[in-house]
Amino acid sequence: MVARGQLERLGERDSVIISAMDKVNAQKYDSVKDYMASLTDEQTVNDSRMLIEMMQRISGHEPKLWNVGTLGFDSYHYKYDSGREGDSFVIGFYPRKGKITVYLMDGTARFSELLAKLGKHTITGYCIYIKQLSNVELPVLEQIVRQSYEYIKSMSKDGPINRILWQTEK
């Protein structure tokens, strides 16, 4: 799966191909329930249910299926100076066997102290990769996700977000 923001680093041709693949894969499932039923690994299913419960509690929203099996909660609008415009989920995750990706649309950089207490994980610009939830401290993960959710909601309350929040200023 290509996460939001990664398309900007790819060439135009690659973006079109990947975008088309995302649409085809996302069309395989009519609902979150159908997607969850397609997961075959018991650990992934259990971890996904826990994350759905956590993110519903934080956002007050049901999960929505975004491209290729990403489960997102709530949404915000963005509009960049480049003219690119769209909607994204505020918090979400992508379950795969052996690696769950938790998305923080404001990035991981501002959470360094909490991430140090999280447990076994790896990070990139706006992703936390976790092999299984039993490897991390769930209250710490919930605190990180809650702070990310509140920040994105505060940034988008007066209109579209006008920059990629997880990228550092140049």
Annotate each predicted stretch with a short phrase:
Residues 6-7, 13-170:
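Charge-dense, helix-prone N-terminal extensions
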